[in-house]
């Protein structure tokens, strides 16, 4: 099975890693698309850790803009949707794997639905209050075809 995994920041990759590792052990083809903070000098170019872990980065999509945070996330989401559309068209995955409640997950859910790809959403049930992440997470869960919550074991 061909899997596209979108990750934009070290904190989500840390959670995705064991899932990706198990998928790799099961001989699935994993295509990682790195975006956002992974590609930033300010955040220590954490995409290099993905490579060090033995995963192939199929595409890098630069979405960080030097504007205020609200404008940056909104415009960056637009850039991510455009770039991810090209990646999905070229790679033709069986499904798209995303985690959480950031712009990466909503972008992947939108692209996956418009391009008739299954969307698997991890960690959709973890509430965060006081910012846009909560409604984004709920929207991604609605758009996802498979929804996985984490359990203690």
Pin down the residues of each PLM region.
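An aromatic- and histidine-rich active-site surface loop
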Residues: 97-114
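Structural motif
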Residues: 6, 33, 98-100, 122-123
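N-terminal subdomain of nucleotide-sugar transferases
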Residues: 1-38
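Conserved nucleotide-sugar phosphate-binding/catalytic loop shared by glycosyltransferases and other
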Residues: 29-73, 83
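Hydrophobic/aromatic ligand-binding patch that stacks against planar heteroaromatic rings
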Residues: 22, 108-112, 139-140
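Active-site-proximal region of nucleotide-activated glycan assembly enzymes
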Residues: 117-153
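Short N-terminal targeting/anchoring amphipathic segment
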Residues: 86-102
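Helix N-cap/beta->alpha junction signal
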Residues: 9, 101-102, 150-153
């Amino acid at each position: 099975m061909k899997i596209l995994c979108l990750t934009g920041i070290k904190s989500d990759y840390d959670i995705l890693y064991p899932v990706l590792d198990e998928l790799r052990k099961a001989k699935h083809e994993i295509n990682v698309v790195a975006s956002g903070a992974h590609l930033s000098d300010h955040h220590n170019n954490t995409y290099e850790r993905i490579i060090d872990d033995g995963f192939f980065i199929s595409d890098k999509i630069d979405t960080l803009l030097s504007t205020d945070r609200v404008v940056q996330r909104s415009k960056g989401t637009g850039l991510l949707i455009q770039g991810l559309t090209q990646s999905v068209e070229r790679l033709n995955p069986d499904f798209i794997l995303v985690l959480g409640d950031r712009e990466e997950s909503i972008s992947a859910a939108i692209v996956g639905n418009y391009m008739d790809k299954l969307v698997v959403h991890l960690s959709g049930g973890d509430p965060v209050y006081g910012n846009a992440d909560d409604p984004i997470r709920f929207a991604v869960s609605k758009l996802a075809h498979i929804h996985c919550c984490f359990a203690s074991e």
